[in-house]
Swiss-Prot record:
Keyword hit for Heme: no
Propeptide: 26-269
Record's compositionally biased regions (Basic and acidic residues): 192-211
Region (Disordered): 186-259
Key words of the record: Cytoplasmic vesicle, Phosphoprotein, Secreted, Signal
Cellular component annotations (GO), alphabetically ordered: acrosomal membrane; acrosomal vesicle; extracellular region
Protein's UniProt name: Acrosin-binding protein
Amino acid sequence: MRQLAAGSLLSLLKVLLLPLAPAPAQDANSASTPGSPLSPTEYERFFALLTPTWKAETTCRLRATHGCRNPTLVQLDQYENHGLVPDGAVCSDLPYASWFESFCQFTQYRCSNHVYYAKRVRCSQPVSILSPNSLKEVDTSSEVPITTMTSPVSSHITATGRQVFQPWPERLNNNVEELLQSSLSLGGQEQGQEHKQEHKQEQGQEHKQDEGQEQEEQEEEQEEEGKQEEGQGTEESLEAMSGLQADSEPKFQSEFVSSNPFSFTPRVREVESTPMMMENIQELIRSAQEMDEMGDVYEEENIWRAQSPGSLLQLPHVDALLVLCYSIVENTCVITPTAKAWQYLEDETLGFGKSVCDSLGRRHLAACSLCDFCSLKLEQCHSETNLQRQQCDNSHKTPFISPLLASQSMSIGTQIGTLKSGRFYGLDLYGGLRMDFWCARLATKGCEDNRVASWLQTEFLSFQDGDFPTKICDTEYVQYPNYCAFKSQQCMMRNRDRKVSRMRCLQNETYTVLTQAKSEDLVLRWSQEFSTLTLGQAG
């Protein structure tokens, strides 16, 4: 069983889950509330499908490597909660661990401590008492509508897509096998190409629920913008854009700078600012056009239409272009709603897709969710030549991240560690947080957690040296198939007061090459060791 490949895991889990499908129908006549724990009888049926223990261990292996957001595991968790995964604290029948901050944490605890058949039970106290207030303050705001459950139908807009630990969207419509094949790969982040589908589903469903409220908000914002922009020049337009950005992220910027930088990016998605920002940018463009004399407008439009596709000047008006550039240059590009909206605008109107390349043959690297796009836009905004975005193909061979983006990243708390004799221990800081925090998050949330994946990818790209720059070797001459396995080993050794660094892979050296199965074991072992450590400290 320990040598099961990802494809075998998938096939096995599909077999395990197939008998679960009739379960909701069987309980349709029961009085159970969606999101409530299973009854003892229902748990007997549920656990029977995960017996013997190797079946439960198989699901735990997948959970350790992919986290709770894997679509197959989402389906499993939904069945364990009458079709809806709860958001917030849950309680268990374990006498020494009676409650957990989330259902995901509960399932990971079961796996790490081999108590595969522990049950979720109803809490004797209200969830609000059990849930720490600090978590709510950090990851929610008064302007973010909070949904408390997630369902198979509306999983893109629900609470499990917005839990504190994993804010990125559900992948229920993805090909599960494709996700498994990229489980520990740094290239496995698919969130860019899913944005259109996610936006359409969210727009269709959320607007039905909050249509009246959103219309009022949009009318108020448009009215405010009309007052701000009427009869004003480019300078006032820049100020309007700054005010507009402040409206879109009321408390986030200050919280971001003072507390936890990379938690801001998921919250931009939660605010659902993209559609509104799109309308605001388009309104700003229209207002900027009206500010000039009609003849000048026509000249500008003719110039714009003459531009080739992908040119930064393809935006309808130079003033609007200045506004957009000003917004991303004067702020930290990767955390601005402007950049998110601008990216969406290009995806929708120009159809470039998630890869970002330019007319100089460069392929901008996606070290974070907006890093590649911001790298290009910062270059375009500062360029004196007509730098264009292009569809990526084999001619774009030069990997590139703009130094302008790197200089901005220092303001969001990322610091590169020192390089000594071809060795690299890791980032001193990422998102303002030290390695111990990220090791703990890796152990509890898994490699596929959005923030963990961004940390891994940024660190991986920070050290490219040796005969094989993209391969991963360490100072104990072990070669890893993916960076998550290496970091799990490094975190585990750090916990044991042993230092293991990444080292350049050389052609004339011999390395112990880990298989994919053994790399998954490393991730699981670190998760188990961390769980044991925290349990010991708590007890």
